[in-house]
Amino acid sequence: LNELKKLQKNNNFNLIAIHINHNVQKDSKKWKTFCEDTCKKYEIKFITHSLRRTKNKTSNLEKKLRDKRYRFFEKTLEKNSILFMGHHLDDVIETFFLSALRGSGIEGLSSIPKERALGKGKLVRPFLNISKSEILMRAKKE
């Protein structure tokens, strides 16, 4: 958020944070509060959306939640909006190995796209070449 605030200051655009509560983890309300407080600190508009709790604990739970999350993003994004996601290098590695274990072919092993169209806007993942530990280290310095 700190880097986006710097960009906003120099480029004059609206910055909005979107928090999705999946209602899966026991600390999900605490995470929402943390995100909301952080956005207040940075003076960033905060939108939160709570997904309906899924009763069946199928192996597809993660996919179902992802699909619901992206449908919300598609509805929420305005024309020419950019949605920045926090996916990082560790996610790329995890996705590759999970796909390989499932027996995906060459196309199924392709990397997470750095950007793609989403609804009326665009989804961008600026941290795909940075590890989670490096992101956390940078955040602690801020």
Where do the protein language model's features map onto the residues?
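Core alpha/beta nucleotide-donor-binding catalytic domains of modification enzymes
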Residues: 1-142
